[in-house]
Amino acid sequence: AQADAIQQVRDTLDRLVEVANEADLEAVAVTDHDRYHPALSAPVEQRNGVTIVRGIELRVDAGSQRLDLLWYGLEPTAALTAEVERIQQNRIDRGRQLIENVESYLGVDLHLEAREGLGRPHIARAVLESEADYDEFGAVFDDLIGDDGPCFVPRDVPDFETGRELLSEACAFVGLAHPLRYDDPEGALSCC
């Protein structure tokens, strides 16, 4: 199963390069939530005429809000790798608890296992595919697993300074993911 997943990731990366070439893009960045892309082994790679920049999207607690920081040109350090592993274990544990909460609350089996990379969108899709009386993705978040939902389980994320320190040693450039999503976009941008 893991070999199949790794092959699927490689196929997805190959498809990204095809699409970049079709769009006449010279470079693309590849990031994932709180983990490194497993098929990229260097901060910058060339594939079929496309420059691929490896990065990471790391959620941090900035006090007044949680921010998703994008870091590019990633060269993992031991400290960052340890933190990413801790975060991934927390995501698995959180996913398991979310699944249990939703199954108990709705009285259904989601036929979903907690695993690395599992997030609330996966759980929402499982609810839609279950016998539960839901047919809209957003309603699952609004009613069940959103930040104020009865099944919500918070994530354990590093504070801003810890994230900044870990990533400044491992990455060349920083950005803010989806800056207009935040309640205070200017405050979010001022952190970067």
Where are these predicted regions, by residue range?
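Conserved, surface-exposed functional patches that form binding/active-site neighborhoods
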Residues: Q46-R47, T51-V53, R66-N101
